[in-house]
């Protein structure tokens, strides 16, 4: 086997694995989109189709009759059932109603329906009216944007310090900072909640916002990795031109860190948009401050039997993060690769 043939086989295998992996990750989203366009009955049916569709009907004597595929004399015909019976049923040929009624012996429940594509776009309109989306979107955007600003501001300064300055115990401090990534949040949950409770912050936005203005280890790591790739000669040139540390950060470092900053910002924005536990813990009893994650949970509990509406409002909630990712995808991928996440 030649080297070229081996490489071709490897590429084919890689392509197949990639397609399978992408399909695996997209499957829940595709199911959600499909379910949001179905009726309640279609979702609860054991024989539901992957796509939204409903049985075809034919109007006969002012009544809508379902179409079935009926075997007659060894030939399958599409007929409309006008009278259902236990052992025999009466059908009519929709292409030739004047030919009269057709009596078919057998159990009609064993027959297959004739289906047609029938998406229920009204689910989105009904779901939108059933929940205060504008309030939920406003609260979620406020929470996501202000915490994204806070984490970018603090993480940038900390990463700049670790990547550009030498100080005592620098390595040990960085190791301690990174070690907090593996620290389970449950370990600090009770002490942190107690502190916020005694400060009188429970029931306000402060416990959700203030901590993000004190850096994040994961974001610091990503930004530091990116900054380490910027030549130090540029810092020296800026210093010769009279720039201090802050001016160097603003004029030299930040313009070159745009991809990494966008990546970190998107990571945090998506996390804040989907954050459920923290708002549930600190905003309990204040529905006017609920973000969309809590709103969807409450909606799901209220409309637990209306699965199609739950999936419709869930798809609506995904629109904003999806659009943001599409717009910033180029910078996001560049920042992820250069900062070392890909590796």
Give the ranges of each region predicted by the language model.
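A structural signal for multi-pass alpha-helical bundles of membrane permease subunits
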Residues: 2-343
């Amino acid at each position: 086997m030649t080297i070229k043939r081996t490489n071709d086989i490897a590429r084919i295998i890689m392509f197949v694995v990639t397609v399978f992996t992408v399909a695996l990750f997209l499957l829940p989203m595709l199911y959600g989109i499909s379910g949001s366009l179905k009726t309640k009955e279609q979702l609860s049916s054991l024989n539901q189709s992957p796509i939204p569709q409903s049985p075809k009907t034919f109007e006969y004597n002012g009544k809508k009759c379902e179409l079935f595929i009926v075997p007659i004399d060894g030939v399958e015909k599409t007929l409309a059932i006008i009278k259902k019976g236990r052992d025999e049923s009466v059908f009519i040929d929709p292409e030739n109603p004047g030919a009269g009624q057709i009596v078919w012996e057998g159990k009609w429940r064993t027959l297959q329906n004739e289906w047609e594509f029938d998406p229920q776009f009204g689910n989105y309109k009904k779901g939108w009216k059933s929940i205060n989306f504008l309030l939920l979107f406003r609260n979620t955007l406020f929470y996501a944007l202000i915490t994204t600003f806070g984490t970018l501001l603090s993480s940038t300064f900390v990463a700049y310090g670790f990547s550009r300055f030498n100080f005592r115990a620098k390595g040990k401090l960085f190791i301690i900072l990174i070690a907090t990534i593996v620290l389970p949040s449950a370990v600090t949950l009770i002490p942190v909640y107690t502190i916020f409770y005694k400060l009188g912050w429970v029931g306000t936005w402060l416990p959700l916002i203030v901590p993000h203005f004190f850096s994040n280890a994961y974001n610091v790591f990503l930004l530091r990795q990116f900054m380490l790739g910027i030549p130090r000669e540029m810092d020296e040139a800026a210093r010769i031109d009279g720039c201090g540390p802050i001016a160097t950060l603003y004029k030299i470092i930040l313009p070159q860190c745009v991809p990494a900053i966008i990546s970190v910002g998107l990571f945090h924005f998506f996390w804040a948009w989907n954050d459920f536990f923290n708002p549930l813990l600190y905003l309990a009893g204040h529905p006017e401050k609920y973000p969309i994650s809590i709103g969807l949970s409450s909606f799901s509990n209220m409309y637990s039997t209306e699965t199609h509406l739950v999936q419709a409002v869930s798809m609506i909630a995904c629109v904003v993060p999806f659009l943001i990712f599409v717009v910033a995808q180029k910078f996001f991928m560049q920042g992820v690769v250069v900062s070392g996440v890909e590796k």
